[in-house]
Amino acid sequence: MNQPWRTHLQTKLKQLHEQGQYRNLHVTEQAEETWLIRDEKRMLNLASNNYLGLAGDERLKEAAIVCTRKYGTGATASRLVVGNYSLYEEVERSICNWKGTEKALVVNSGFTANVGAISSLVCRHDIVFSDKLNHASIVDGIILSGAEHKRYRHNDLNHLEALLKTASPEKRKLIVTDTVFSMDGDTAHLRELVQLKEKYGAIIIVDEAHASGIYGIGGAGLSHIEKDLAQKIDIHMGTFSKALGCYGAYLTGDAIYIEYLQNMMRSFIFTTALPPSTLGAVQKAIEIVQEDHKRRENLIANGEYFRSKLREAGFNIGNSSTHIVPIVVGSNENTLRFSKRLQEAGIAAIAIRPPTVPVHSSRIRFAVTSQHTIADLKWAIDRITHIAKEEELFV
């Protein structure tokens, strides 16, 4: 191997070790269940994004099997060549009916959706206003676009408006935000963001990755808690890989936006389409989340219980108001130690460190699901509290 390269890479890896930011892959089995096997140890699964428990649902499995038998295992090409099976258009129609939009585009992942859409819509002559805690895919899309990047303090509408006021009226402006923030579990102020985008002549993209299938009318997303609000969002992005238990993502909104992205988005044009089996499962999942109110109600209730009990115990869970509940520890070292102790006690509790979260805010990110019982959560809370006291972390 080229020696200068080897030296460079070894130095970088050593730095990651020293900073407590080195990452390993661990073998996991049965992650679609409430209890999983990780490194051959049985643990309560409080780490996955399978929020409604659909990843293991027999109806989705059967839909995937039927489509595999009919269409094969791969799409064989990009959608613009010969990979655009009728399944794609069926799913896109379902998304439009679900979200009340004109046109939709199914893409391969939430990351490629955000990177592709943002880098296609704006360029170096434009300005993007982005919440400081937005997902990495949003940040990377802005960087790739070359647009001026204005980051406003998390959920600070006054700061956002101050930035909008100073922007040149001639420049095109895009506001982009997560709706549910993936590492904090709090939510964006969508009504106020829409008011600002209208006041200053911007457009807005919302990332519903952690809200699709859960919140709003029929689980259509946080922007659908109020029907008239959703209609004022220019582009909605959501994923099938979390509450819907599948894989892939969608972009939807007014037809002209989606038509433009279909023609300009490089992460859509230059990639093989999703396999037919995935589309079959997605179609079934979209049906289920609209009909199965009980799953969504259970998830919301479990989130409320878990948050309230951790707050009562004295933990810092920030402003979480959803099914995503972080315990903010601070240092990488303490967070890794806490995570290790929790896993030894039978809880899948994964340390989240920079650059995923800001420096000095390392945490354990818990995610409850609709399938957890109160007994499961109480069992976990008792152990979390006991270990935190033993480690003299904060309780």
Curated annotation (Swiss-Prot):
Q: Name one Pfam family in it.
A: Aminotran_1_2
SUPFAM superfamilies xrefs: PLP-dependent transferases
Keyword RNA-binding assigned: no
Q: Name one GO biological process term.
A: biotin biosynthetic process
Give the encoding gene's name.
Answer: bioF
Residue numbers of N6-(pyridoxal phosphate)lysine PTMs: K242
> So where does substrate get bound?
R23, H135, T356
Cofactor(s) the protein requires to work: pyridoxal 5'-phosphate
Could you tell me which CDD domains the record lists for this protein?
Answer: KBL_like (cd06454)
**Could you say which EC number(s) this protein's record lists?**
2.3.1.47
**PANTHER family linked to this entry:** 8-AMINO-7-OXONONANOATE SYNTHASE, CLASS II AMINOTRANSFERASE/8-AMINO-7-OXONONANOATE SYNTHASE
Can you provide one Gene Ontology molecular function annotated for this UniProt record?
Answer: pyridoxal phosphate binding
The reactions it catalyses are: 6-carboxyhexanoyl-[ACP] + L-alanine + H(+) = (8S)-8-amino-7-oxononanoate + holo-[ACP] + CO2
* Subunit and partners: Homodimer.
Pathway assignment reads:
Cofactor biosynthesis; biotin biosynthesis
Chain positions recorded as pyridoxal 5'-phosphate binding sites: G110, F111, S182, D207, E208, A209, H210, T239, F240, S241, K242
What this protein is called in its record is: Putative 8-amino-7-oxononanoate synthase
Q: Which family does it belong to?
A: Belongs to the class-II pyridoxal-phosphate-dependent aminotransferase family. BioF subfamily.
Q: Which UniProt keywords apply?
A: Biotin biosynthesis, Pyridoxal phosphate, Transferase
Q: What does this protein do?
A: Catalyzes the decarboxylative condensation of pimeloyl-[acyl-carrier protein] and L-alanine to produce 8-amino-7-oxononanoate (AON), [acyl-carrier protein], and carbon dioxide.
Top-level taxon? Bacteria
